[in-house]
Swiss-Prot record:
Keyword NADP tagged: no
Gene transcribed to yield this protein: Tmem64
Topological type in the membrane: Multi-pass membrane protein
Chain intervals with Basic and acidic residues compositional bias: 37-47
Ranges where the record places region VTT domain: 187-297
A GO CC term assigned to this protein in UniProt: membrane
Family from the record: Belongs to the TVP38/TMEM64 family.
Residue ranges of the TM segments: 52-72, 85-105, 121-141, 161-181, 189-209, 310-330
Protein name stated in the entry: Transmembrane protein 64
Gene disruption phenotype: Mice exhibit increased bone mass due in part to impaired osteoclast formation. Bones show reduced osteoclast numbers. Increased osteogenesis and impaired adipogenesis observed in bone marrow-derived stromal cells.
Pfam families documented for this protein: VTT_dom (PF09335)
Superkingdom of this protein's organism: Eukaryota
Organism: Mus musculus (Mouse)
Amino acid sequence: MRNPGGSLPHTLPRALQHAGRTGVVEQPGRWAPERTAGGDRSEDRLPRGGGASAAAAAAAAAASGALLGAYLERHGLPAASDLPAPAGALAGGPGSGGGVVVGVAEVRNWRCCCLGSTCWCRSLVLVCVLAALCFASLALVRRYLQHLLLWVESLDSLLGVLLFVVGFIVVSFPCGWGYIVLNVAAGYLYGFVLGMGLMVVGVLIGTFIAHVVCKRLLTAWVAARIQNSDKLSAVIRVVEGGSGLKVVALARLTPIPFGLQNAVFSITDVPLPSYLMASSAGLLPTQLLNSYLGTTLRTMEDVIAEQSLSGYFVFCLQIVISIGLMFYVVHRAQVELNAAIVACEMELKTSLVKGNQSDPSGSSFYNKRTLTFSGGGINIV
């Protein structure tokens, strides 16, 4: 006959686990199953096997209860951490005797780390793909760009300047492209000083013409395109405020396309002379960097002709410094622009709460025609 005490190490943890799960640890003498809703105890109910099996089950339960009581009186209650976890329970869960937060927090932290590493890997892959596309495009059109630059260089000086001015006018419209290419080409062909002067004059003329044309003919088209962009809508609202010129200058340093910025600012009520001055001031840092980059590309031909290792090193260092400085300027401009947008919107909300929107003084900031977009009202002229 099997000794009933041999099953005690298996019976005891399960019984104590049940007691710890319900939150109540009873005394050994009072250890008894719960009563049912009808008031009968669970061992009084007859199982399907009949009365004989019920009597055997009752005797086994009584023997186990006696052994359990004797064991508890001698050794005491075990610690909660020694109890086995139920099937499917996490470490640190309710059935293991520990805190439920520990296991769940570990799983969540692991998942967040995995997601963060996945996002980082995706960003790295995207940067590599974009870099590969840029180098491939440069390799494909390098010969054509070289022939084009040589053709422009062979032209008369005045004709070449007029050609650059026409190019800056074209890229100043919303659908134009190639603003940075023209800047680098001007520095490449005319040097740092003359190329810089050509850039300033050409961009000023192109900005003026694009502003007037978009304001007279393309206001509805520009407003329809802006309504789906929260960032451009916020820029317009801030430009309509008191710090509009600062926002215009900061926006010129952001990666927003040059022609698109001209179209966006054309539907505001910023005075044209002030707008041109703020645009020129905002574009000046990137123009300096692009002109210097074009001048560096001019020196690349001398480096290749000399086949000097130190020349290659200096050229690569100049390129890296120029690109890094450009990224830093753009990043700082984005931070300042976002701060200006937040500050102006908070000021606008405060003024609306105070009732300044009905100011009879005729302030141009509140007495404008308003277009209702999906993201809110955008003031335009």
